[in-house]
From Swiss-Prot:
<protein>
    <recommendedName>
        <fullName>Chaperonin GroEL</fullName>
        <ecNumber>5.6.1.7</ecNumber>
    </recommendedName>
</protein>
<dbReference type="GO" id="GO:0140662">
    <property type="term" value="F:ATP-dependent protein folding chaperone"/>
</dbReference>
<dbReference type="InterPro" id="IPR027410">
    <property type="entry name" value="TCP-1-like_intermed_sf"/>
</dbReference>
<dbReference type="Pfam" id="PF00118">
    <property type="entry name" value="Cpn60_TCP1"/>
</dbReference>
<dbReference type="GO" id="GO:0051082">
    <property type="term" value="F:unfolded protein binding"/>
</dbReference>
<keyword id="KW-0413">Isomerase</keyword>
<dbReference type="InterPro" id="IPR027409">
    <property type="entry name" value="GroEL-like_apical_dom_sf"/>
</dbReference>
<dbReference type="GO" id="GO:0042026">
    <property type="term" value="P:protein refolding"/>
</dbReference>
<comment type="function">
    <text>Together with its co-chaperonin GroES, plays an essential role in assisting protein folding. The GroEL-GroES system forms a nano-cage that allows encapsulation of the non-native substrate proteins and provides a physical environment optimized to promote and accelerate protein folding.</text>
</comment>
<dbReference type="GO" id="GO:0016853">
    <property type="term" value="F:isomerase activity"/>
</dbReference>
<dbReference type="InterPro" id="IPR002423">
    <property type="entry name" value="Cpn60/GroEL/TCP-1"/>
</dbReference>
<dbReference type="GO" id="GO:0005524">
    <property type="term" value="F:ATP binding"/>
</dbReference>
<feature type="binding site">
    <location>
        <position position="496"/>
    </location>
    <ligand>
        <name>ATP</name>
    </ligand>
</feature>
<dbReference type="InterPro" id="IPR018370">
    <property type="entry name" value="Chaperonin_Cpn60_CS"/>
</dbReference>
<comment type="similarity">
    <text>Belongs to the chaperonin (HSP60) family.</text>
</comment>
<dbReference type="GO" id="GO:0005737">
    <property type="term" value="C:cytoplasm"/>
</dbReference>
<feature type="binding site">
    <location>
        <position position="51"/>
    </location>
    <ligand>
        <name>ATP</name>
    </ligand>
</feature>
Amino acid sequence: MAAKDVKFGNDARVKMLAGVNVLADAVKVTLGPKGRNVILDKSFGAPTITKDGVSVAREIELEDKFENMGAQMVKEVASKANDAAGDGTTTATVLAQAIVNEGLKAVAAGMNPMDLKRGIDKAVAAVVSELKALSKPCETSKEIEQVGTISANSDSIVGQLIAQAMEKVGKEGVITVEDGTGLEDELDVVEGMQFDRGYLSPYFINKPETATVEMDNPYILLVDKKISNIRELLPVLEAVAKAGKPLLIIAEDVEGEALATLVVNTMRGIVKVAAVKAPGFGDRRKAMLQDIAILTAGTVISEEIGMELEKAALEDLGQAKRVVINKDNTTIIDGVGDEAQIKGRVAQIRQQIEESTSDYDKEKLQERVAKLAGGVAVIKVGAATEVEMKEKKDRVEDALHATRAAVEEGIVAGGGVALIRAASKAAANLQGDNEEQNVGIKLALRAMEAPLRQIVANAGEEASVVASAVKNGEGNYGYNAGTEEYGDMIAMGILDPTKVTRSALQFAASIAGLMITTEAMVTELPKDDKLDPSAAMGGMGGMGGMM
């Protein structure tokens, strides 16, 4: 086991604080409408330019191991805020730095760290409940656009695109961000349920100009097995032919004689059929077939529940207004499923999302919710260079997370104002169990001014003057650093999602409290692997006369 280096008390805290400040100082220059960029060197390819706090934090590793421990703990604050709300990483870092700096000053003055931490925790709990009281629901498209614009660093086009996307696919719909091909940002919307399986034979195509299969008011047969024997399908095919409607077959696979017969019947015009493979694999495929069944008011023909394909009747088939199939995707538009059943299924999947521990599973479950709830929107980010594209994509993803958070928990006044208002309301009723807890409460409430001060400092104004003016105001009165004006922040469209502000404060206080109560730090001593240069050159003494 390697030897360890141990530091105690003030020595440890000084080192830790130095690390905290290096990381936080690099991150906080990005805060606010006039925040600057940070350039990150990459071991390969062009450097990355970003205004995303968590991207900056993730890049920082310090040479001094004790300082690095401090930096890594603040990095954890940014990462946690990013995971919880998808935004607010810079705010969380600024708050953590302020609480740690104030807290360690109090510890150095002889205060009890545990009581300070208890005071900080009390202050944060009170401020969080005040934030919830200040919060108002984010319902209109205009508010969603404003939240998106602020989070994308005042890029109004991004805000508009996100608002349009949410309007089209609903607040539950999936919105993804992809690289565009031109200079302009674009929005593509896929309505209905789309899954990544195309037609099993190009002979099903009935729209040669677009190489697609299009069906109006089709029946949809859902089968949880491979179909290779046409005899199993004949009763359903005859019933559908009599009804005079097209048929879409979604099965594990359709092959051999069965596929050949379907193709021949389609080409002769006897019955209009198309077949696609069911999406997903294993249990996920079964779940997705069930989703499609609920969406189209059909039944999955599965031998597991004693159903046989030969005995399937028209009432077992699902229906939709329209189906479009190309070589890669199938889209079912306007399934006739019962609204209450669809909502019940969505609620069931949401419960699974809550219980799931895997990010991959959560993402797949979220996709299923979106497909049931209304559609998928793709924002294609346009830029002149790849470096700009990466930077812009980061901002769009941040804005998207922020708008989702706003829809979930509502919005508060932005620009650091909500924290100041919540802190002043909380201060009126807060009392610690002893004087040292009161000091903890006061330092936490004082630290909550830090985001506003940093936004103002980044805009080149005097932070103390603006902070004093905002504190003396009421309600949503604050300072718009973009236009350098005072006024009603919500009326000016400067909004923050409540969830982002709340998460930033809670994670910052949690990690800062742990750092304030640190009394010793342990790290490995560096290994001394370097050779002694004089020993390495010892055998070359006879070369002296050659110079």
